[in-house]
Regions:
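N-terminal Rossmann-like NAD(P)+-binding domain of SDR-like oxidoreductases, especially those catalyzing
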Residues: 1-183
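Short-chain dehydrogenase/reductase
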Residues: 97, 146-154, 190, 194-198, ...
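Short, basic/glycine-rich phosphate-binding loops at helix/coil junctions
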Residues: 182-184, 221-222
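C-terminal substrate-binding subdomain of Rossmann-fold SDR/epimerase-dehydratase oxidoreductases
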Residues: 201-339
């Protein structure tokens, strides 16, 4: 089986490529390297001992996609490519809608014309409405998103759902991620954000190593046990395994399916800081900063459907997540730039 992975040089994409290659699948990656590095692909090959085929291009390049589908016998697609910073999306909404929505439409058009009918879409817990009770189920209310990034994921989900109605021979799996952290246990690949991190774990690890002076904790007056925001953190390798499980399911089940990929347990920002310090015997200085607009007090998944239908559940512990994040950071203090 050959899998086309858009955004395969990125954080989640590269770890998923490792899992796909180790399961014996062939992998073709398309990535424009706007927020990723080709070094990730070289290290994926180093980890697995297997090659991947890489096309550097934007997924919105229809002629480029036609070339890929002509040159490679693609069986299914995992669509990671897109802009992904929640805060930045509020400052650059047009770019986010153009990139995330546009790439999805162009990709589906190319798939349709080349007879490829199986796609896994990299969605997000941000599609859920902010007024849901916890935990979040696949049937919880969506829409009423709190930022443009979430809306782009919501719109892309709807595009794919509408297309399955128009052509029921398609298999579409929407995977709603919660908060991926951690890195491959080898320390060879991990999360390498450009500029100041948007996600908590690279912010913690870059502060611990001295690349950043202090961690900003956005708000300590939420209705949570310690006043800081609670999220469902999941090891990126668990997330990668979820995609392999979804490929197997998708091959036998046409139509649309939705699955949460989370642990079902939430941790606060301060709990994460203390867990990281304990796991790695380091100090993480932090300061309390004002709340960020759109941040919810508590978000965590109910992953029962994924366990029941996909046979998937998170296996890595919080200590594993913290340890692997730190291993990546210490092996690559400046990310892939040190290569």
């Amino acid at each position: 089986m050959t899998v086309l992975v858009t955004g395969g040089m990125g954080y989640i994409g590269s770890h998923t490529c490792v899992e796909l290659l180790e399961q014996g699948m062939d992998v073709v990656v398309v990535d424009n390297l706007v927020n990723s590095s080709a070094e990730a692909g070289r290290r994926v090959e180093q980890i697995t001992g297997r090659p991947l085929k890489f096309y550097q291009m934007d997924v919105r390049d229809r002629a480029g996609l036609d070339r890929i589908f002509t040159e490679q016998k693609i069986d299914c697609v995992i669509h990671f490519a897109g802009l992904k910073a929640v805060g930045e999306s509020g400052q650059m909404p047009l770019e986010y809608y153009d990139n995330n929505r546009g790439s999805t439409i162009t990709l589906c058009e190319a798939m349709r014309d080349h007879g490829v009918r199986q796609i896994i879409f990299s969605s997000s817990a941000t599609v859920y409405s902010g007024d849901n009770e916890m935990p979040l189920y696949e049937t919880s209310r969506t829409g009423n998103c709190t930022n443009p990034y979430g809306w782009t994921k919501y719109v892309c989900e709807q595009i794919l759902r509408d297309y399955v109605v128009a052509d029921p021979s398609w298999s579409v799996v929407l995977l709603r991620y919660f908060n991926p952290i951690g890195a491959h246990p080898s320390g060879l690949i991990g999360e390498d954000p450009r500029g100041v991190p948007n996600n908590l774990m690279p912010y913690i690890s870059q502060t611990a190593i001295g690349r950043l002076k202090c961690l900003s904790v956005f708000g300590d007056d939420y209705d949570t046990p310690d006043g800081t925001g609670v999220r469902d953190y999941i090891h990126v390798m668990d997330l990668a395994r979820g995609h392999v499980a979804a490929i197997a399911y998708m091959a036998e089940h046409p139509g649309e399916s939705i699955f949460n990929l989370g642990t079902g347990k939430g941790y606060s920002v301060l709990e994460m800081v203390h867990a990281f310090e304990t796991a790695n015997h380091v100090h993480v200085p932090y300061r309390i900063a004002p709340r960020r607009a759109g941040d919810l007090p508590t978000v965590y998944a109910c992953p029962d459907k994924s366990a029941r239908i996909l046979g998937w559940h998170a296996e890595y512990s919080l200590e594993d997540m913290c340890r692997d994040s730190w291993h990546w950071q210490t092996q690559n203090p400046n990310g892939y730039e040190t290569a």
